[in-house]
Amino acid sequence: MPRHGRRGKLPKGEKLPKKEGGDNTPSKLLSSMLKTLDLTFERDIGMLNGKSVRSIPNKKTLLELQSQLDSLNEILGTIARGDQETIEALRKIRDSKNEKQANDEKQETSNADGQHESSTATEETNIIDKGVQSPPKPPPSNEISGTIENDVESIKQAADNMAKEEINEDKDLQVHRDQPREKRPFDSETENRATENENTQRPDNKKQKIDVDKMENDPTVKNPKSEFVVSQTLPRAAAALGLFNEEGLESTGEDFLKKKYNVASYPTNDLKDLLPGELPDMDFSHPKPTNQIQFNTFLAFVENFFKDLSDDNLKFLKMKYIIPDSLQFDKTYDPEVNPFIIPKLGPLYTDVWFKDENDKNSAYKKPSPYSNDASTILPKKSANELDDNALESGSISCGPLLSRLLSAVLKDDNDKSELQSSKIIRDGGLPRTGGEDDIQSFRNNNNDTVDMTLSQENGPSVQTPDNDIDEEASFQAKLAENKGSNGGTTSTLPQQIGWITNGINLDYPTFEERLKRELKYVGIYMNLPKDENNPNSDDPDWVTGREDDEISAELRELQGTLKQVTKKNQKRKAQLIPLVERQLAWQEYSSILEDLDKQIDQAYVKRIRVPKKRKKHHTAASNNVNTGTTSQIAQQKAANSSLKSLLDKRQRWINKIGPLFDKPEIMKRIPNESVFKDMDQEEDEDEADVFAQNTNKDVELN
């Protein structure tokens, strides 16, 4: 009879498939897989540890792991097939033993029936013989010898059958080793035998069930050489102890969670909001840094953010404007006016530097070429007296108001290139190449020594003849018309064609005064800041009171931002005042509650304090004992009454004042949303583009 392998082992004639690496057992394969993934097994906690636990390995590692898993699957499949064959062989042996027992029982029952019939026949003959009794005849020797021979023959036949079955089993195991379990003939044969022997083996069904249950659940029968099997031992032990088992229960629901964690109530919230923050997933086993910050320094930094509020904070919020200490008692300072005043211009750095040079060289003093004298900006003479020589000097100039208006309507600098390119195209003609013919004609026509190139680029000069000026004016009118049809800039004023106004010879001072009167009549030149040096004049201070420089523009922009920020801060402070008042009330409530808790702790300590034992005096021992017990009882009653009154006071304080506030964990928690959320949305809507609606309408119409 061949010896079958144990569970988890291959049959004797079969070997595991060998790999190139030499890892041909499951344990070696598992250890090599751990090395591939760079993992270690911590026996203390029963978990894996390594880099691959938190991050995904690279592709090369995963491919190597896949090959190892395939080989492990193949080896485990081979072992599983060997185990299945061993189990089927054991079933065959068990069935043969059961058949042998059944045959033996049948023979015993048949022999017993024959003996019973012979005994009944002898009894009947005795009765017929009228009470004549005779000893029972022993069975003949032939019968005894026949029964013995039959028993021996049956034993020999059973042994031969068992040997033949074992030989057939070995052959069938070799032939049907690669077949799945469902298609093997062993199961069908056992099923047929079971159906055939159902009627004959009914008394033995209970015994067979007991044997099957014992083989499947008893580790000593199924796996006799293993000391401990988890799948066979722990479930039965847990059921015997009445421990929790998830089988048969729903995986969701509060009752399931209560039974699983053995608690009276299970929270519906994960309590994440009560945590101080996200739990760090870091390794804190590294040594501390050498330049570690002191704890007192950290507390001093954090205290500004977590300290209790006070009345000073409320007073600060109720202040409309924050005024520096140096301006607190200055009555001339107005926080609504002074921050938005642009100071007057001081002396130019060129003047300051020139003055410093003159102070150093007092013997060689020179007049400053840069001066802030009002006479330098006043209108002088008229345009009729203007020539090329007067352009470099300041003897002829227009007033400050006219110069600003002219600068607002002058052409841009980039219009010069367009003017040059359009001049060389006449009525759809080709542009000139500027050859020798043009140069020769230019030289021949240059009778009055006029620079035509300069006149073409910068307009007519003061010495240009009248006919050339008229031609240039007509050309400018056509150019303006073409540019107006194609779209020009807003800073150019196209000239009208068909009429020419007769110029009035006005000097610049007169023209400046007429311009002021017209602007006042329209309502523009009004409510201007007065000149402090000349209060009787209606004109502003054009020298030091100008606000058209870059610094003044930047100051105006910053002042506009200051107005918006001041308005926003006032709204936010008004919204914070009720919140701070509520927080101050909560702080007062908490401080009183803490005082009550301290008093209760002190009273409880006095109540449970054991009095010191005094030395006994033998003379008046009885009197001292009586007085001691009475005083202790009185003190105990007083302590109990004071503790009870404190507890009642604390309970009344919590029940009466506590409902005015939210829960303590909510009052101490940092809010999840900003208290200015709605205000910020309103400000964003106010700062939106006012032309957005019109633009959308135009888009819809188009």
Curated annotation (Swiss-Prot):
Mutant phenotype after disruption: Increased sensitivity to genotoxic agent generated DNA damage.
Motif (Nuclear localization signal): 606-618
Keywords: Chromatin regulator, Nucleus, Phosphoprotein, Transcription, Transcription regulation
Top-level division of the source organism's lineage: Eukaryota
Keyword Nucleus: yes
Modified residues (Phosphoserine): 134, 407
Biased composition (Polar residues): 109-125, 620-636
Function text: Component of the transcription coactivator SAGA complex. SAGA acts as a general cofactor required for essentially all RNA polymerase II transcription. At the promoters, SAGA is required for transcription pre-initiation complex (PIC) recruitment. It influences RNA polymerase II transcriptional activity through different activities such as TBP interaction (via core/TAF module) and promoter selectivity, interaction with transcription activators (via Tra1/SPT module), and chromatin modification through histone acetylation (via HAT module) and deubiquitination (via DUB module).
Name of the protein described by the UniProt record: SAGA complex subunit NGG1
Protein source organism: Saccharomyces cerevisiae (strain ATCC 204508 / S288c) (Baker's yeast)
Taxonomy of the source species: Eukaryota, Fungi, Dikarya, Ascomycota, Saccharomycotina
